[in-house]
């Protein structure tokens, strides 16, 4: 099944053993804490790992060679773990507020020997990393205007944020215009791709660039971010 990663421009041959190890570790662990709803290897790869690694479409297009990446709401490890497996030169901080999921991420990093993966158990709006990261990512957390406020304060000016979205992305982009203006950022690209599932499942990476410093008032407290999104 790993040959499907060639569609994303990835050479998987040197990474297949580590991916297999992670997938089995994930399935075994998920029986304990229910990381995803459907526990089988093929679905895990096609729905979650392949989707996570679509990041390479952005990475190649924008010639990203290295840097520090903050993944917001890493949960069961997507996209953080597959990215850490494939991209040795990207140092990844995986943030999540659920202790049992951070425990899983720490054990996954140790099991796979991932020196470039650093799990952190904190709420996104409470992270102590203002303007420290070159890159950001978020998958399956919230609507775009919400996750932008969670993520952009932690990026350096000129940094890129990648949001994994369905093809309803255009509506989310429209609703995020106030947030983009307030946070001094803009959507610069939308990269579409298709998951290798039996049914057609199209997705999009929304690429956001931070153009200037984020005002100090952001991110606001979590209750405000959710109840009164920008």
Functional labels for PLM-detected ranges:
Residues 164-168, 192:
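Short strand-turn motif at the edge of the Rossmann-like AdoMet-binding core
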Residues 2-64, 100-117:
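Class I SAM-dependent transferase core
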Residues 42, 53-142, 148-149:
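Conserved SAM/SAH cofactor-binding pocket of Class I
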Residues 101-103, 169, 173:
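Short alpha-helix immediately C-terminal to the canonical SAM-binding loop
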Residues 159:
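Glycine-centered, small-residue-biased loops immediately flanking beta-strands
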Residues 155-156:
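Helix-to-beta-strand junctions that scaffold the AdoMet/dcAdoMet cofactor pocket
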Residues 26, 83, 165, 208:
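Residue-level signal for inorganic ion chemistry
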Residues 174-230:
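SAM/dcSAM-binding transferase cores
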């Amino acid at each position: 099944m790993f040959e499907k990663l060639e569609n994303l421009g990835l050479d998987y041959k040197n990474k297949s053993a580590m991916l297999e190890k992670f997938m089995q570790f994930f399935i075994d662990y998920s029986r304990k804490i229910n990381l995803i709803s459907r526990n089988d290897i093929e679905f895990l790869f096609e729905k979650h790992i392949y989707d996570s690694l679509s990041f390479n479409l952005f990475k190649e297009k924008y010639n990203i060679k290295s840097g520090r990446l903050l993944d917001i709401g890493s949960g069961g490890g997507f996209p953080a773990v597959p990215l850490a497996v494939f991209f040795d030169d990207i140092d990844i901080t995986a943030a999540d507020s659920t202790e049992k999921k951070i425990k899983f991420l720490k054990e996954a990093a140790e099991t796979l020997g991932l020196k470039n993966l650093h799990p952190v158990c904190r709420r996104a709006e409470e992270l102590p990393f203002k303007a420290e990261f070159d890159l950001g990512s978020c998958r399956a957390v919230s609507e775009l205007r919400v996750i932008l406020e969670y993520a952009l304060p932690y990026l350096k000016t000129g940094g890129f944020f990648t949001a994994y979205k369905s093809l309803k992305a255009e509506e989310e982009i429209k609703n995020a215009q106030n947030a983009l203006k307030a946070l001094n950022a803009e959507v610069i690209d939308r990269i579409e791709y298709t998951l290798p599932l039996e049914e057609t499942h199209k997705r999009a990476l929304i690429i956001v660039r931070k153009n200037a410093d984020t005002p100090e008032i952001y991110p606001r407290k979590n209750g405000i971010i959710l109840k009164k999104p920008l």
